[in-house]
């Protein structure tokens, strides 16, 4: 009798392990989105103003996220010497007409101490405002290797971002619990949970959604795309069951934003297709103001991130309506970059947008529907 080959035993063991992990995910009904809030026109006339969130406290500042909690905008971002450096930390600030002084709320040392494991670096944060008033913060950390070996950590605040709980590590993958990253905001579900867009960079670049209950139990994990060139999905729902996702494209030119659709609240997604929107391998942000149109912030370029624009449209037709930042000079000793937008809508009807300004600062724009509709 021939012995069983080692590779067969290895594959069988992996299959059993993966199957057991899948069984640990609770059985649940299909998700249902909370319907988008209908925000009436303010009838105040056009309003637009700009503010600095960060002011060169660190050499670089990047990957901001914004959320509204109890009517107050709160922003987070990471800053330090440069992306991936050991001194990079997560910072937070809140807005009440002006932005408060940035506060460091997490770094590799505090994360390492809380998790009891070595942390090499931290990165991308994203905020989520729970319906019960909690403010959640997801951010990535790496123990060994690059971003492809990331894990997601979670903290929360009960006082509009003034104080935060110690981080916990979410278990999102059966394979060493690595290669899951966040960038964009989650969507609220009718059962109180959240559908969090995530992506992977290990053995490819592809997008997923992670469905979490209000107590952070992993309820489901759904693949959005496959392959090596689609990441950082930005998702918004159109009603209780349908949603659109726009994905950053990192493949061969021409660079275009990828789009996907779901008709069952993210239980299944269509095959990604290229839109007509340019994408220079850069993140986008999408929201549904609830007025019959969608709003998208993007770098509408095939190369470079020196222009940041707003587009209005529907599922498959988009029009650039505003150019927010643009630098056309070519004789500079550096490249300008206005990138990684994050948008949200307040109960007062104002749209808030934060983004990386030239890799050095975080900038905030506040505007209303009337300003968007100006020619």
Question: What residue spans do the PLM features occupy?
Answer:
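Asp-box/BNR beta-propeller blade signature and adjacent active/binding-site loops
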Residues: 4-375
